[in-house]
C-alpha cells in the first residue's frame, strides 16, 4: 500500500546523483527496493541505501522531477520488496559500478560480514558517490575509467586479479559489468543485484521477466547459478517489450 513520507533532507552526492532521506525508517534487507510514486509523473523502483535513504541518478523525466523536491516535500512509497543479499562467512568482495553503489552501501553498513573489501568504479572522480562507505568496510579499492581517481580501469580488472581471496562476491552496477563479474567467477560464489524494467513491483505484470524469474519477486538479488542459463548479460527488454542486445 502506498504511504506518504516527508523528505527530511536532500543533497547532491556526486555529479547528477542526489540523496533523499525521508522520515520513515524501514525494516529491510540490503538489496531490497521500494517503489516511489510521484503524482502525475510515474512510479519507479529504487534500491534502498539505508533504512530511510535512496540515492538517485538523474536519467529521465521521473528522476528530473524527483531532483526538484526539497526538504519538507512529500514522496509516496511502497515496499520494501524483493529478495536481498544473503550473508556468507569469510572474506567477501563488494563490487559496485556507477549508480550500483546504493545496495552495496546498505550491505556494507548493515551486513554482519566478517571481512569486506569494496571494489568501486565510476567513469570519473566526480561520479563517485557515498564515499563514506569507507567507514563500513575493511578495505576500499577505487577505479575510474579515466584515471582521475584511484586505479585507471574497471572494478572487474581488480576482481580478476584477486578473485581467489573471496568466499563470496556481491555486485551491483551496469549489466555488462555484472556479466563480466559472473564470467570471472565462473558463475560461482556470486550474488548479483539485477535490473529490469519494472511496473508493479509485486510479481503480477511480468514486465521484469528474466529467464524463468521475475526480478521484482525472485530478485532483485540472484546467485550466479540462477543467472547462468538466462539471457542476463546478453539482452534486455525495453519498456515496450522489445529486445535490446547488450553487446
UniProtKB/Swiss-Prot annotation:
Lineage of producing organism: Archaea, Methanobacteriati, Methanobacteriota, Thermococci, Thermococcales
Organism of origin: Pyrococcus horikoshii (strain ATCC 700860 / DSM 12428 / JCM 9974 / NBRC 100139 / OT-3)
Gene: pyrK
Self-association state and partner proteins as the record states: Heterotetramer of 2 PyrK and 2 PyrD type B subunits.
Pfam families documented for this protein: DHODB_Fe-S_bind
Cofactor note: Binds 1 [2Fe-2S] cluster per subunit. Binds 1 FAD per subunit.
Residue ranges occupied by any FAD-binding FR-type domain in the UniProt entry: 1-87
InterPro entries (UniProt xref): Cyt_c3_hydrogenase_gsu (IPR012165), Dihydroorotate_DH_ele_sf (IPR037117), Dihydroorotate_DH_Fe-S-bd (IPR019480), Dihydroorotate_DHASE_ETsu (IPR023455), FAD-bd_FR_type (IPR017927), FNR_nucleotide-bd (IPR039261), PyrK_electron_transfer (IPR050353), Riboflavin_synthase-like_b-brl (IPR017938)
Name of the protein: Probable dihydroorotate dehydrogenase B (NAD(+)), electron transfer subunit
Keyword Iron annotated: yes
GO-annotated molecular function: 2 iron, 2 sulfur cluster binding; electron transfer activity; flavin adenine dinucleotide binding; metal ion binding; oxidoreductase activity
